[in-house]
Curated annotation (Swiss-Prot):
EC annotation from Swiss-Prot or TrEMBL: 2.7.1.130
Protein name: Tetraacyldisaccharide 4'-kinase
Disulfide bonds, paired cysteine numbers: none
GO biological process, one term: lipid A biosynthetic process
Residues involved in ATP binding: N58, V59, G60, G61, V62, G63, K64, T65
Family matches, as HAMAP family: LpxK
Family to which the UniProt record says this protein belongs: Belongs to the LpxK family.
Pathway annotation from the record: Glycolipid biosynthesis; lipid IV(A) biosynthesis; lipid IV(A) from (3R)-3-hydroxytetradecanoyl-[acyl-carrier-protein] and UDP-N-acetyl-alpha-D-glucosamine: step 6/6
Keywords annotated in UniProt: ATP-binding, Kinase, Lipid A biosynthesis, Lipid biosynthesis, Lipid metabolism, Nucleotide-binding, Transferase
InterPro entries reported for this sequence: LpxK, P-loop_NTPase
Keyword DNA repair included in the entry's annotation: no
Superkingdom: Bacteria
Source organism of the structure: Chromobacterium violaceum (strain ATCC 12472 / DSM 30191 / JCM 1249 / CCUG 213 / NBRC 12614 / NCIMB 9131 / NCTC 9757 / MK)
GO MF annotations in UniProt: ATP binding; tetraacyldisaccharide 4'-kinase activity
Length: 339
């Protein structure tokens, strides 16, 4: 973990003082931008179907993508046609682009590829309003749009805002960037519709009456990169030199999950979130290399050597929610729109 990230969760007095002016400037700019949309100085674009934003007020991996995948699964089970729009972080799409199974993660980003694999129409673009219109033009049967991230993208009008919080790390120092991990102050939570807490541990200063949902990430058995039906449990890795590789926002959670599964990992490799992997990133001396589903979609496109691919294993996770968030969303939208 970098020094600045350590400071976010274990503040150092001298660094707090040093970064205070930059934090103040960031706070001023963030507040001014939000007020510009709230007061009508800047206008938001509204789509013809309800929009639910799945976002966060802090940086780093909090579990938005597993949550979005869980909602896609639950909405599909209810017969609700849902589309997803995303910025496509890590991608370079210059205009709204629909994500397909053969899309290049360097163009559309890694998380959208994972979401598209779930069967939902996904469109990425810097302008989320344009992305939503592009999606609806191609998929006019979509009844609801989930915006994966985009809480601070106020140009997109939204019907519901759901914030995901990391239950173990909480809000860190509670300070704004670069002095803390927050994009917006904790008071922003008073304006959202609900929070989803991923895991447990931290005491979270949540506003009274704010609907709260608990999310648990449950790992499945590791499966081969090229064959999801070929699974291996902890015993299958016994006696082998195992490495774990992660290019996500909070890699420690992934490593801890492997340990909780009883998999002995000799080498842990952390890369920046949305890292563009190359074959040289795979440790040559490991018998097996376990990766996240998010990283697997990128590695599958850059690792072409058969022997190297055979050493790659994917740890899938599935989010479960309590109480039923999908049902709550539908009820809130019905109350708001009468449908």
């Amino acid at each position: 973990m970098r020094l600045i990230e350590q400071h976010w969760y274990r503040p150092r007095g001298w660094l707090t003082a040093l970064l205070a002016p930059l934090e103040g400037l960031f706070a001023l700019l963030a507040a001014a931008r939000r007020q510009a949309f709230r007061r009508g100085w800047k206008t938001s674009g509204r789509l013809p179907v309800p929009v639910v934003v799945i976002g966060n007020i802090n940086v780093g991996g909090v579990g938005k993508t597993p949550l979005t995948l869980a909602l896609l699964r639950d909405f599909a089970a209810r017969g609700v046609k849902v589309g997803v729009i995303s910025r496509g972080y890590g991608g370079k799409a210059p205009a709204p682009t629909e994500v397909g199974p053969d899309s290049d993660p360097a163009l559309v980003g890694d998380e959208p590829l994972l979401l598209a694999a779930a069967g939902a129409p996904v469109v990425v673009g810097r302008d989320r309003v344009a992305a939503g219109r592009h999606l609806l033009a191609r998929h006019p049967d979509v009844e609801l749009i989930l915006s994966d991230d985009g809480l601070q993208h106020y140009r997109l009008a939204r019907d519901l805002e759901i914030v995901v919080l990391d239950g173990s790390r909480g809000l860190g120092s509670g300070r704004l960037l670069p002095n803390g991990p927050l994009r917006e102050p904790p008071s922003r939570l008073a304006a959202v519709d609900a929070v989803v807490v991923n895991g447990e541990g931290a005491q979270l200063p949540l506003p009274d009456g704010l609907p709260r949902f608990a999310m648990t990430l449950r790992p499945g058995a590791c499966h081969a990169l090229d064959d999801a039906s070929r699974a291996r449990d902890a015993a299958g890795f016994a006696g082998r030199k195992v490495a774990a590789l992660a290019g996500i926002g909070h890699p420690e959670r992934f490593f801890d999950t492997l340990a909780g599964q009883g998999i002995a990992v000799e080498q842990r490799l952390s890369f920046p979130d949305h890292h563009a992997f190359v074959p040289g990133d795979i440790p040559a001396d490991a018998d097996a290399v376990i990766v996240t589903s998010k990283d697997a979609v990128k590695l599958a496109r850059v690792i072409h050597d058969a022997a190297q691919r055979a050493r790659l294993w994917v740890l899938p996770v599935q989010a479960t929610l309590a109480p039923d968030l999908c049902e709550w969303i539908l009820a809130r939208l019905k109350t708001k729109h009468g449908r």
